[in-house]
Amino acid sequence: MIERVKGTRDFLPEDMAKRRWVFEKIREVFEAYGFKEILTPVMEYTKLFQLRSGEEVVKQLYAFKDKGGRDVSLRPDMTSSVARLYVNSFQMAPKPIKWYYIANMFRYEEPQSGRYREFWQAGVELIGSDKVEADAEVIALFVESYLSTGLRDFTVNIGDRILLDEFAGMLGVSDDIGLMRIIDKRDKLSQEEFINLLKEFGLGESEIEKVLELVEIKGRPDNVLPLAEELFKSKKAKEEISKLYKLTDLLEWYGVKDWIRIDLGIARGFDYYTSIVFEAISPNELGIGSIGGGGRYDNLIEIFGGKPTPATGFAIGIERLLPILEWKGLIPKPQTGPEVFVIPLKDMEKVAINIAVKLRREKIKTDIELSGRKLGKALDYANRVGAKLVIIVGKRDVERGVVTIRDMESGEQYNVSLNEIVDKVKNLLKR
């Protein structure tokens, strides 16, 4: 027997109904904000991801040579692909460009709660504006996307890569990305493990104390940003903190400030982020951490051969969000069975087909008995698959111009004229 590939899953009808519900909730909000859907190839040249995705992501690539000897990889994220698409075809398009996607990604990592080797993300990219208003628009959409699913218990934590760069300079550290990677892991480590990593990196006691001070600068913007002003003295840092003040003020006007926190220890795992970064956390007992994140990447398009073009965006981790929504009871029980099941008795198949066609054309989910079962077994099947109504098409009834409709929940039966079947079904289904 051939097994399923490790780290992947099969989605059954009930699973797909739940996923589709989440996708559509998020899609509605994306489109309400003026974003338009795109999809890029699942494969790209490996070099695209090696240029700027980050050491950890590059290590996790599903990379191989195709039959032409070209190095290709399954996409580990969409931002690089979107930047490539922009450079290829849209540099002269009106700005800003607002795109969204709902797509699957691949990373060779150890499967665990909320983490798989094939996973889905819903995300947006806003290309062509370096204004803090663009950051506010994207972060507000990030918050609204979670709210659209009924989730309320979450926070969006905002950090800044420029401030981390300035902090590395304050410590005299030349390998700022190396320091960021350690800081970014702090929530996954004990205090002792975190300090040991900083020591191995080459920091002394006084520098480690400053790092510990930095990672504690987190909380509501009004409380945290004054602390950041005390820690950072350079002109560049002051300008960035001023931007964070403006950002949080704008987010208040969007009506989402209650979900916003500042966390200056956030770096995110991708090397292409250049300024504001953010991630969403929802408390849970499932072992799931971040449920999505994003940030500004003003240099990526230039690295891929385009003209310097600012951009910002985010991705929501569906495999992380969906279990939390289920755990909190926020996903409606899906209706995977037919709304109507039509059972033809002897020689009544053509009439049954005609009835099914009329219902289907009214977008009523209709199935038909195709196995030739006797009435009792066909009714058992209809009950097992969750049909709400059964239409029994018998020869004597049809000769009188009627059929029998049975409500499977109440057990009530109705003799209904052939010409009134659609209206009666809609009435019983409360359409």
Swiss-Prot record:
InterPro entries referenced in this protein's UniProt entry, alphabetically: aa-tRNA-synth_II, aa-tRNA-synth_II/BPL/LPL, Anticodon-bd, Anticodon-bd_dom_sf, His-tRNA-ligase, HisRS-like_core, HisRS/HisZ, HisRS_anticodon
Keyword Cytoplasm on this protein? Answer: yes
Q: Matching Pfam families, A to Z?
A: HGTP_anticodon, tRNA-synt_His
Keywords assigned by UniProt, alphabetized = Aminoacyl-tRNA synthetase, ATP-binding, Cytoplasm, Ligase, Nucleotide-binding, Protein biosynthesis
Superkingdom of source = Archaea
Keyword set includes Nucleotide-binding: yes
Q: Which GO molecular-function terms appear in the entry?
A: ATP binding; histidine-tRNA ligase activity
Give the EC number. Answer: 6.1.1.21
Give me the reactions it catalyses: tRNA(His) + L-histidine + ATP = L-histidyl-tRNA(His) + AMP + diphosphate + H(+)
Subcellular localization(s) per the UniProt record:
Cytoplasm
Q: What sections of the protein cross the membrane?
A: none
Q: Which GO terms describe its biological process?
A: histidyl-tRNA aminoacylation; L-histidine biosynthetic process
Q: Name a single GO cellular component.
A: cytoplasm
> Which family is this sequence assigned to?
Belongs to the class-II aminoacyl-tRNA synthetase family.
Protein name from the UniProt record: Histidine--tRNA ligase
Q: Which species is this UniProt entry from?
A: Pyrococcus horikoshii (strain ATCC 700860 / DSM 12428 / JCM 9974 / NBRC 100139 / OT-3)
